[in-house]
């Protein structure tokens, strides 16, 4: 498969066919790419062709790989509206591959200079600092995620859960204590012998069991009077006793 020269270092989109299949490639270059770095352009073309062949040979398991001068990051995405396209090579109808391959290319020296943090002439200082800050942020995030798992330093989420559980258990214990206290006071104080007095606590807003007042000693009650006769007979009996009428009749 012979390829036309690439537009390095400018991005481009190429349609390549192998057999009866058509493949769409997007080639994108990173900020570390400079056109004047490599004088022999034939070397660049050969490395790009080898990169495309490597991608076609490993379409189902794409992984980053390294050439003599570049680091290639291959990606695969869906080819939109590919069913509406038709390709022919002479009289042969070609079948388009339903995915698009995108190659992100960086200079090999770019990755080698990142661990030391020292920028080279090919890499701007701002780019190196940005990469180092991203790495430090990742390390801090990983450290924060690992800290809650240690028993000595529980994370904020775990501490919040423990505080809520302790508060709920304390509230439940207070309710049980109040219930048992009320039952004991009811058992110790019969309703027929004494009277229970409850006071209202203005701060807590609930009734508290009060003091128990001993029963009062009552003297013997006076005998009940017979109900007086009512009506006209009662009025007559009040004026003239009955024995007066019986005495008159006997005479």
Swiss-Prot record:
Stretches of Polar residues bias are at: 183-198
* Topology with respect to the bilayer: Single-pass membrane protein
Please list the residue ranges that the record places on the Nuclear side of the membrane.
1-227
A GO molecular-function annotation = DNA binding
Q: Name one Pfam family in it.
A: MAJIN
- Keyword terms of this UniProt record: Chromosome, DNA-binding, Meiosis, Membrane, Nucleus, Telomere, Transmembrane, Transmembrane helix
Family according to the record: Belongs to the MAJIN family.
The annotated subunit structure for this chain is: Component of the MAJIN-TERB1-TERB2 complex, composed of MAJIN, TERB1 and TERB2.
Q: What is this protein called?
A: Membrane-anchored junction protein
């Amino acid at each position: 498969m012979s390829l036309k020269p690439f537009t390095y270092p400018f991005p481009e989109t190429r349609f390549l066919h192998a057999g009866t299949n058509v493949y769409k490639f997007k080639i994108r270059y990173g900020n570390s790419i400079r056109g004047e770095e490599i004088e022999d352009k034939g070397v660049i073309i050969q490395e790009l062709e080898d990169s495309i062949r490597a991608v076609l040979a490993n379409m189902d398991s794409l992984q980053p790989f390294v050439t003599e001068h570049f680091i290639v990051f291959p990606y695969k995405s869906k080819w939109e509206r590919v069913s509406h396209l038709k390709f022919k090579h002479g009289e042969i109808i070609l079948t388009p591959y339903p995915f698009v391959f995108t190659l992100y290319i960086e200079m090999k020296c770019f990755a080698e200079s990142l661990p030391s943090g020292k920028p080279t002439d090919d890499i701007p200082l701002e780019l190196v600092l940005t990469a180092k800050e991203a790495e430090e942020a990742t390390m801090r995030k990983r450290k924060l995620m690992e800290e809650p798992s240690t028993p000595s330093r529980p994370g904020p989420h775990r501490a919040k859960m423990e505080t809520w559980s302790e508060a709920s258990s304390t509230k439940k214990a207070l309710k049980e204590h109040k219930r048992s206290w009320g039952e004991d006071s009811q058992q110790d104080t019969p309703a027929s012998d004494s009277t229970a007095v409850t006071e209202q606590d203005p701060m807590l807003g609930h009734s508290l069991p009060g003091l128990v007042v001993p029963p009062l000693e009552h003297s013997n009650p006076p005998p009940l009077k017979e109900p007086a006769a009512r009506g006209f007979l009662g009025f007559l009996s009040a004026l003239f006793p009955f024995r007066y009428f019986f005495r008159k009749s006997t005479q």
